[in-house]
Structure formats: C-alpha cells, structure tokens
Amino acid sequence: CPRCGTALSSHEVAQGYKEVEEKSVYVKFPVSGEENTFFLVWTTTPWTLPSNVALCVNPEESYVKIKADDGFYWLAEALADDLFEKYEVAEKVSGKQLEGKKYQPMFDWAGVENAYYVTCDGYVTLTDGSGIVHIAPAFGEDDAKVGRAYDLPFVQLVNNRGEMTEQTPWAGIFCKDADPLVLEALEKKGQLFAAPEFEHSYPHCWRCDMPLIYYARESWFIDMSAVKEQLVANN
C-alpha cells in the first residue's frame, strides 16, 4: 500500500478487492527493421509502460501479422476479429517463433541493455486483449518470473510512495493518476491504438481503502503457521 507504506500478504490483499472501471490501453510497439509494422499490446496498467523492458507471448498459441488500413500488426490469431473489422493475414507463426524479435522502446528513459524483445511464457492467455502483454519486472509476479528467466533489466520508475520518479515527465504524481498522462503521451507519439473502458476486480488496502500496486521491494514476512503451536502454548 503506497499510503500505509507496507507490503501486504496475499491474505490481506484478498480482503480488499473491488470492481472498478478504468481505461485499458492497446499500444503499438514498432517492430525493429520492419517499416510500419507493430506489435499490438494490451495492458490495464498504463502507468507501468514507462518501466517496460520486454513483450511476452504464449509460445503454444498461433500469431498472425495482419495488413490493416494503417499498417501491419502482430497479434494472436484468435483475437484478430475482435480488434479489426477488415484485414488480410500476411504471415502466420507460433508464439515461439516470435521469441527474440526486437521492437523499438516506447520510452527509453532508463537506457538499459538486454531489453526490448519478445519473450515467451504460458501465463499469457487469449481471454482478453491481443495475446501480447508487456513486461515490467518490478510490477507483478508473472513479470518478475519472466524477467528472471530472460535476465531482463530491472526498471522501477515508481518510488515506494507510488509516485512516478524524476526520470519521467510526471515526477511526484501518484502512478494510477498518471494513467491519462501516459495515454496522452502515447497519442502524441502515434502509438495509441485504442483505450477502451475495462471493468475488472482490483485490490485495495483493507486499512485505508487506497488502491494497491504490485511493487517489488524488500520485505519480511513471518510464517505464523510454523509457530502456531508455540503461540497457543504460551497463551
């Protein structure tokens, strides 16, 4: 919780879920070496995009490069009809075949190496979105797992108060309040494909009702079940 300054256990997080409606975003990541070609990426947390270091696809799923009115797009074959009314399939591959394919970073404020390419992991589903997700290892368990598997750099452009850092143009602004500013920046760069409203369940602090953020930090947790018998005996 950025307000309380404390990490929460999974049990505490489970106590504060609320249904919220906020903007998700489909982002156009330019594919390196391919003119007017983009990876179409979906996220419900635009504030994490400045900390992006990779993209991720499901290695077992089918992906297509489609020709649309305004360019070429890579996305999951099963989701193409949901996002485009009219298109032609130019190429079809497995997710595994996209592994290692490079793209141009949206924001390169961190100046990192060994970054900005496609990774693979089975956690990517085709339930929503485009079948391609962005990876920011500092903000999520799955992202961190992929980051370790590919030895990706650790970029955390949000401080422990939940504010955007000085490396971004939005220093001091609470990360979730920065969402519309990130969308505005994407639109100016011509990389905003769409920003539909998305209703989903989001965790809030059970103490203060503040929206929680998934944030990598050093923490200590006590395994109370391991000392349960001793606690009962002492009381």
For each predicted feature, which ranges?
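Residue patterns forming the tRNA-binding/recognition surfaces of aminoacyl-tRNA synthetases
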Residues: 1-50, 100-102, 111, 123, ...
